[in-house]
Amino acid sequence: MDIKRTVLWVIFFMSAVMLFDNWQRDHGRPSMFFPSATPTRTVGSAAPGTTTPGTQPADLPATNAAAPGNAPAATQSQLIKFNTDVYSGEIDTRGGTLSKLSLVKQGDGKQPDLVITLFDRTANHTYLARTGLLGGDFPNHNDIYTPLPNQPHDLTGDEKSFQISFESPVKGGVKVIKTYTFTRGSYVIGVDTKIQNVGTTPVSPSVYMELVRDDQPVETPRFSHTFIGPAVYTDQHHFQKMTFGDIDKNKQDYATSADNGWIAMVQHYFASAWIPQQGAKRDIYVEKIDPALYRVGVKEPVPTIAPGQTVDVSARLFAGPEEERMLEGIAPGLELVKDYGWVTIIAKPLFWLLEKIHSYVGNWGWSIVLLTLLIKAVFFPLSAASYKSMARMKAITPRMQALRERFKGDPQKMNSALMELYKTEKVNPFGGCLPVVIQIPVFISLYWVLLSSVEMRGAPWILWIHDLSQQDPFFILPVLMAVSMFLQTKLNPTPPDPVQAKMMMFMPIAFSVMFFFFPAGLVLYYVVNNVLSIAQQYYITRMMGQAKTKAA
């Protein structure tokens, strides 16, 4: 029993250490275990789209090195601002590029509005959605587009949608009219590329649609490493994600061509994705284009356009929160950007159940409490077996200590005597281990559900907890966590080794300090789980004591 408890504590402690190490690396600090050189970012050395030599396919255009605001007056671009009920953003006339996009979650009066900037182009951060033409000297994201006159830039009144269109200069006998369609309440932007052949010879361009960003995380929670990087989905190969480290090492693995699916950039809570027309053949590319910039995109060939003819290429651009039900309705497989890792098969049903509970109680905090209670009820038989084993071990602990003292000079005889004691009392020292091990994947899955669900962002619980995705502002839950862990150690058998006993007493303090920085929703889950475990253990131990008294 002592060995089992020690092993479980060691596993728990090592997991916590690894989470802390991931947090270190997420925040640009050296790993405690795998130190490595960090590439230096040099502001102004390369603009978005400029590639490291040898990394860019010959047919993809490079970006003009002049950053916005530094270009010559003749080629100075403008920023066209727009607003909807869910977006606030800017479109750069250089390329008609969506260069800034802030997501706005309206408050309910009690809670303030929540705003996060997803797309942006500054000296410290780059994240863009851009398009253009390939296959000749055609308009691309480097050219200055002209916004069409008399266009609305805001969603007002009862309007359901509005459009903003941009016209390119004529290049290679081709003119492009790019139109963005914004819809009320929607995180999907329609992007229409109208290609007009105004020349005298046929042309056969390709349209590229790409997402470009640096490797800087946004709103990453402490003590956790959530995925950030590009992803590709096709019906044939399903969901394929790549870390920026994979791309650095040229180890990215993904489908390079398809006629379905989408490409995306994924980060904690939020994602963006280009969703081309299904059935249209396209090539897919993922690459590093600068010491700290990466891109994922598609190239879609266009049928030959005769002089005077026009071809439309339509696509959808998703940019928003990773809300599973919404994502399922946008495109097949898009809900997979909410990444649970290896516990997906358990985590998805748990989140579904959490959603169902929330649909009745209307509060994510109470939903966590009720889901934890439900899980503990399901696992009660297994927990009971574990606690009964612990109770039996606690009952014979004085006799075990006496045997250890008696045979402390002869380990072989001591082990033989202990085995005989276990046999006589019908106690298995590892009897409580299997029930605990079976439950571990479920509790790990619930951890990732709470960590990955954007629904927790800005969600209040009670009184002082106004955001379950942020740490407890007054550290009340971490203190309750420490108290509950301390009570659990008191209910368990006292280790015979004084050093081990002191370590067990120190553990609640160590973990409570770490949990001070965990999201409140996670700490709430652990507190409720511990309280229920204490109640179960106390009840079972008391019942066994009463049964023993009656038998006597």
Swiss-Prot record:
Compartment annotation: Cell inner membrane
Residue ranges crossing the lipid bilayer per the database entry: 3-23, 364-384, 430-450, 504-524
Membrane disposition: Multi-pass membrane protein
GO molecular function ontology, one term from the record: membrane insertase activity
GO biological process, one term: protein transport
GO cellular component: plasma membrane
UniProt main location, coarse: membrane
Superkingdom field: Bacteria
Compositional bias ranges of the Low complexity kind: 42-59
Key words, A-Z: Cell inner membrane, Cell membrane, Chaperone, Membrane, Protein transport, Transmembrane, Transmembrane helix, Transport
InterPro entries (alphabetical): Membr_insert_YidC, Membr_insert_YidC_N, YidC/ALB3/OXA1/COX18, YidC/Oxa/ALB_C, YidC_ALB_C, YidC_periplasmic_sf
Residue segments, region Disordered: 36-59
Gene3D superfamilies, sorted: 2.70.98.90
Record function comment: Required for the insertion and/or proper folding and/or complex formation of integral membrane proteins into the membrane. Involved in integration of membrane proteins that insert both dependently and independently of the Sec translocase complex, as well as at least some lipoproteins. Aids folding of multispanning membrane proteins.
Protein family per UniProt: Belongs to the OXA1/ALB3/YidC family. Type 1 subfamily.
The protein's assembly and partners: Interacts with the Sec translocase complex via SecD. Specifically interacts with transmembrane segments of nascent integral membrane proteins during membrane integration.
PANTHER family per UniProt: CYTOCHROME C OXIDASE ASSEMBLY PROTEIN COX18, MITOCHONDRIAL (PTHR12428:SF65), OXA1 (PTHR12428)
This protein's name: Membrane protein insertase YidC
Species whose genome carries this gene: Paraburkholderia xenovorans (strain LB400)
Name of the gene encoding the protein in the UniProt record: yidC
